[in-house]
From Swiss-Prot:
Keyword Cell inner membrane listed: no
Assembly and binders: Interacts with FAS/TNFRSF6 and BAX.
Summary of the function given for this chain in its UniProt record: Antiapoptotic protein which protects cells uniquely from Fas-induced apoptosis. Regulates Fas-mediated apoptosis in neurons by interfering with caspase-8 activation. May play a role in cerebellar development by affecting cerebellar size, internal granular layer (IGL) thickness, and Purkinje cell (PC) development.
Higher taxonomy: Eukaryota, Metazoa, Chordata, Craniata, Vertebrata
UniProt protein name: Protein lifeguard 2
GO cellular component: endoplasmic reticulum; Golgi apparatus; Golgi membrane; membrane; membrane raft; postsynaptic membrane
Amino acid sequence: MTQGKLSVANKAPGTEGQQQVHGEKKEAPAVPSAPPSYEEATSGEGMKAGAFPPAPTAVPLHPSWAYVDPSSSSSYDNGFPTGDHELFTTFSWDDQKVRRVFVRKVYTILLIQLLVTLAVVALFTFCDPVKDYVQANPGWYWASYAVFFATYLTLACCSGPRRHFPWNLILLTVFTLSMAYLTGMLSSYYNTTSVLLCLGITALVCLSVTVFSFQTKFDFTSCQGVLFVLLMTLFFSGLILAILLPFQYVPWLHAVYAALGAGVFTLFLALDTQLLMGNRRHSLSPEEYIFGALNIYLDIIYIFTFFLQLFGTNRE
């Protein structure tokens, strides 16, 4: 008994109080801790786990709410995500590099088309055996016209073949060869001086119109209705001339028609040039490089043929 009393008496002071406190901690129910004071919250002290209730589950945002500024995010480069993406999936004409690549591609194709056509015209103009053969066999002319019309409708009306390689280049090659044959055969009926003169006039006019279209602030793409009316006027004028031609040839009426045609397609050249540039009311998609080259090529060829009818002199 004495030892027991001594053992109890020999306990360190405060031990019994600690056991009581531990017992109270085990038996007392959990009470949520009080929120920290303003000073503790602002100084970062007193921020213990369990001081606040758990955050609610995330609510999915509407796409229009979750806006990210591309210029302030490291995952964007020049407004586009840095991951794998198509170059032209999200296209902006404000990108000067994309515009230059597109215009360069169109004019490269156009240059090849014009060189092929120039070679055919030179062959039909300077080589007498070839010139005599094509004039003696008009069936090739109508066959080339049918091929030209079919390929033109395919490229102009069907976006699938026009945009998919290699069908777009194959169709454009066939179209260019057929149009070159038609232009060369028409040139074979005029003397060499007239052909060279009209080639020079066409080159100067097309170069001037192209530079003007790039520099002017006037938007030709907003005048498509006016150009369509002029084109219909030209079409019906040509139809009337075709009806009157078997009965009587009127030189001045034919000259007016040729001047009207050259003027209309000069305006169309300005329109098609501005469609390549962007920064206008209407612009071509960067996938339409075949369509852009096709339109400008036709404009230049029609300008040349109308100048040939206006200034050319037939061979004797």
